[in-house]
C-alpha cells in the first residue's frame, strides 16, 4: 500500500514542482540561501569571539622580531585580535572608553628579538612582578668597534685593534661582571630627563650627561663562541640590566672597544623563547587562550590574577603611559599598557 501511495504521490510532485536541479535558477537560489545562512551566522560567531576576547585575563609570551619597538608590537597584536573578533578600531574604542587592555613588562630594543611578556585584561596588573625577575639573553658582540648607541644601529665613534685578544682573555674577565655590580646605563635608552627619554634627546642633538652607575645583578655569564672579532655570550641577569653596556664594558676591559651586533632574549621569568613565546602567526584568540592557561600556571600563586581584586570599571578603560616601580626608575622597570 505504501508503495502504491508513493507511486501516486510521486507523479503529483513532479507535475507541481518541476526538477530545476542543475539549472541557472537553482544555482542562484542556492547562492542566495547560503548567503542568508552565512549572514545570520556571522554576527553570532563574531559576538562570541568578542566576548571570549574581552574575558581573557592573565599573562603570556610572544616572540618579538627585530624591527618594531615593544610598543609597536603590542599595537600590532591588539589590532590583530580586534580584527579577528570583528570589533571596531582601537581609535573608536578609545573614544568609547571601552577597549581591550594589554600591556608588556620589560622593554626590548627595536633591534633586539625574543621573549616579550604580555598581560591582557587583569593580567596587566601582574606585569610589575615580571620586571624584577631574571632574564636570559644570547648576544653577539663585535670587538674593535664602538658606536654611540652601543649596538650596530648607531654611528661608529671609535675603532681599536683587537687582533691580540684571545678566548682565554675574554673568559678571564667575565667574573668581574658577575654578581652584584655597578653599571652605567646607555645614553640611548628609555631613561628619562625632564620627562623626556634620553634617546629622544640624543636624536634631537641635545647634550645629555652620562647617568651615574647603579647596582645591577648578573647571575651568570658564559662565552659560547669566539671567532674574532665576534664573541657570543649567554647572560642571565636581573631587572634593569643593559646587555649593551655589558658588551661595551667588556671591550674596554680588554683594552679595545665593542658593541652589540645581535641580541636575543631567550627567557623572561619562567617563560622561554622555545616553549612559550607565540610567533605572530599564532596571535589568535584561541591560541592566546591556551597560552594563558599554560603560562599563568607557571607563576607563583600569589602573582596570579585570581589573587587580584577585580575592578571591572578600570579593566574597560585604556591606560596609557608607563607605570614605574616605586623603588627604581629603570627602562626595564616599566610596564607599558595600551
From Swiss-Prot:
It is an enzyme of class 5 (isomerase). The modification N-acetylalanine is found at residue 2. The active site is at 109 (nucleophile). Its main location: nucleus. GO terms for molecular function: pre-miRNA binding; pseudouridine synthase activity; tRNA pseudouridine(55) synthase activity. It catalyses: a uridine in mRNA = a pseudouridine in mRNA; a uridine in tRNA = a pseudouridine in tRNA; uridine(55) in tRNA = pseudouridine(55) in tRNA. Pfam families: TruB_N (PF01509). Its EC number is 5.4.99.-, 5.4.99.25. One of its GO terms (biological process) is positive regulation of pre-miRNA processing. It is found in: Nucleus; Cytoplasm, Cytosol. InterPro entries: PsdUridine_synth_cat_dom_sf, PsdUridine_synth_N, tRNA_psdUridine_synth_TruB. The keyword Transmembrane helix does not apply. Keywords: Acetylation, Cytoplasm, Isomerase, mRNA processing, Nucleus, tRNA processing. GO terms for cellular component: cytosol; nucleus. Belongs to the pseudouridine synthase TruB family. HAMAP family: TruB_bact. Pseudouridine synthase that catalyzes pseudouridylation of mRNAs and tRNAs. Mediates pseudouridylation of mRNAs with the consensus sequence 5'-GUUCNANNC-3', harboring a stem-loop structure. Constitutes the major pseudouridine synthase acting on mRNAs. Also catalyzes pseudouridylation of some tRNAs, including synthesis of pseudouridine(55) from uracil-55, in the psi GC loop of a subset of tRNAs. Promotes the processing of pri-let-7 microRNAs (pri-miRNAs) independently of its RNA pseudouridylate synthase activity. This is Pseudouridylate synthase TRUB1. It comes from Mus musculus. The lineage of its organism: Eukaryota, Metazoa, Chordata, Craniata, Vertebrata.
